[in-house]
């Protein structure tokens, strides 16, 4: 998927002194504005140059009540007490006001105090409004000096942005509706999944999942591997094979001695006593030879049995497998990240232009969007060009890093439904950072 592809022509006519939303609620699609042009027909007799301003919500504005409701952190007792206070105030207002005898001077003082309180409250409200919204000048156009001005503004549907014109002339904005990185319909992606889904799928899955299977294989193979010392202590055969080989050797020696005895008796009958003495010597020598063998055999088996061994390779493989388990962290707004691979170089920070590969899935495992080949998806981190969960989850990654980002609905698209993404959807992204500028 290539990012920022134009879909259709965008146009907006901004009349003087009328705040105009940048994006229609009925068509929540990302827009890119490239030109502002002046309407040469004046709407009043003053014919003053028109100044185009953009008004947007302050990202640093701390609306605690809104954040608490968004994250589910609110005090039920406190809300109940607020409701009770409101009910009491309503009851007091419904009661008939009692007439009190007061001097005219006191009434005048009270009215002045009330006016001062109302003025201070209105001043505070105006300050809050000023803190909540920011206003910036984009261009000043006049039929005498300049009719138009090139722009390059990208506005996402979730941004609260309006345009205001001050002056005598209307200003028209033109550009394109563009393909948002998360706006790919399910049907389009299913068709292309077999064609271009091999590159990054292998990159992500092989680097993480194959490690788990390779660890299991390593355990099986390590169980049958012996060290050189173990090979020396326990050769190919078992204890029974050692005993069988020694018995065969003794039988061969007995056959040889019997054969010699038979020949000697057949040819030298007169040396019978000498032969008997020779036989007893052979028997004694045979016993002396067998005793060291048995001793050596017992030592072998005993030494093998009582051998103290260090940590086995299986235990080492299990410890390595535990070390490879991704570390899970919870960030702002409930965004969860799991680092699969740690890259090299500096970490991405707010304002950096980052290039990403990614695979986006719903909670049920269905893939709704991906960028695994071709041109990477590039955006400016922390500037609101993507959903808030990406600005939070991508921060801190370095080139080559792979990470899983689990984004709750308030930090994704919230109640807004997009093609392939139902409303209030939790989104999961497997991402890889490929460039930082």
UniProtKB/Swiss-Prot annotation:
SUPFAM superfamilies: FKBP-like. Residues 286-295, 304-328 have a biased composition (Basic and acidic residues). Residues 61-94, 111-135, 188-205, 213-233, 240-252 have a biased composition (Acidic residues). It is found in: Nucleus, Nucleolus. Residues 351-437 form the PPIase FKBP-type domain. Keywords: Isomerase, Nucleus, Rotamase. Residues 257-269 have a biased composition (Basic residues). Residues 42-146, 179-328 are annotated as: Disordered. Inhibited by both FK506 and rapamycin. Its EC number is 5.2.1.8. One of its GO terms (molecular function) is peptidyl-prolyl cis-trans isomerase activity. Its main location: nucleus. Coiled coil: none annotated. One of its GO terms (cellular component) is chromatin. It catalyses: [protein]-peptidylproline (omega=180) = [protein]-peptidylproline (omega=0). The keyword Glycoprotein does not apply. PANTHER family: 39 KDA FK506-BINDING NUCLEAR PROTEIN, FKBP-TYPE PEPTIDYL-PROLYL CIS-TRANS ISOMERASE FKPA. Belongs to the FKBP-type PPIase family. FKBP3/4 subfamily. PPIases accelerate the folding of proteins. It catalyzes the cis-trans isomerization of proline imidic peptide bonds in oligopeptides. This is FK506-binding protein 3. It comes from Candida glabrata (strain ATCC 2001 / BCRC 20586 / JCM 3761 / NBRC 0622 / NRRL Y-65 / CBS 138) (Yeast). The lineage of its organism: Eukaryota, Fungi, Dikarya, Ascomycota, Saccharomycotina.
């Amino acid at each position: 998927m290539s990012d920022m592809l134009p879909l259709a022509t965008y146009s907006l006519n901004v009349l003087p002194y009328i705040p105009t939303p940048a994006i229609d609620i009925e068509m929540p699609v990302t827009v890119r504005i490239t030109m502002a042009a002046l309407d040469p027909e004046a709407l009043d007799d003053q014919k003053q140059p028109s100044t185009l301003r953009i008004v947007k919500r302050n990202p640093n504005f701390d609306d605690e009540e809104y954040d608490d409701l968004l994250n589910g952190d609110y005090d039920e007792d406190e809300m109940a007490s607020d409701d009770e206070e409101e009910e009491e105030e309503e009851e007091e207002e419904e009661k008939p006001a009692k007439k009190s005898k007061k001097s005219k001077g006191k009434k005048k003082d009270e009215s002045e105090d009330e006016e001062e309180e109302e003025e201070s409250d209105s001043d505070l409200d105006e300050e809050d409004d000023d803190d909540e919204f920011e206003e910036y000048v984009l261009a000043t156009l006049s039929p005498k000096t300049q009719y138009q001005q090139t722009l390059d503004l990208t506005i996402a549907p979730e941004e609260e942005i309006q345009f205001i014109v001050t002056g005598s002339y209307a200003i028209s904005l033109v550009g394109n509706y563009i393909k948002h990185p998360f706006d790919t319909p399910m049907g389009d992606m299913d068709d292309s999944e077999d064609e271009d889904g091999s590159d990054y799928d292998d990159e992500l899955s092989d680097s993480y999942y194959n490690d788990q299977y390779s660890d299991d294989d390593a355990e099986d193979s390590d169980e049958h591997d012996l060290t050189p010392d173990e090979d020396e202590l326990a050769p190919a055969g078992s204890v029974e094979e050692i005993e069988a080989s020694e018995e065969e050797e003794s039988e061969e020696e007995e056959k040889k001695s019997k054969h010699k005895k038979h020949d000697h008796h057949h040819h030298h009958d007169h040396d019978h006593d000498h032969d008997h003495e020779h036989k007893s010597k052979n028997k004694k020598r045979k016993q002396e030879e067998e005793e060291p063998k048995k001793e050596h055999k017992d030592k072998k088996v005993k030494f093998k049995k009582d051998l103290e061994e260090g940590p086995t390779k299986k235990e080492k493989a299990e410890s390595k497998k535990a070390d490879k388990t991704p570390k899970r962290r919870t960030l702002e707004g409930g965004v969860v990240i799991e680092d699969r691979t740690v890259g090299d170089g500096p970490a991405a920070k707010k304002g950096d232009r980052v290039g990403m590969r990614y695979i986006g899935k719903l909670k049920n495992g269905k893939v709704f969007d991906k960028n695994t080949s071709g041109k990477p998806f590039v955006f400016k981190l922390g500037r609101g060009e993507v959903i808030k969960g990406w600005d939070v989850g991508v921060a801190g990654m370095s080139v080559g890093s792979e990470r899983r980002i689990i984004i709750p609905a308030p930090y994704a698209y919230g109640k807004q439904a997009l093609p392939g993404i139902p409303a209030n959807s939790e989104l999961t992204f497997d991402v890889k950072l490929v460039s930082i500028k």
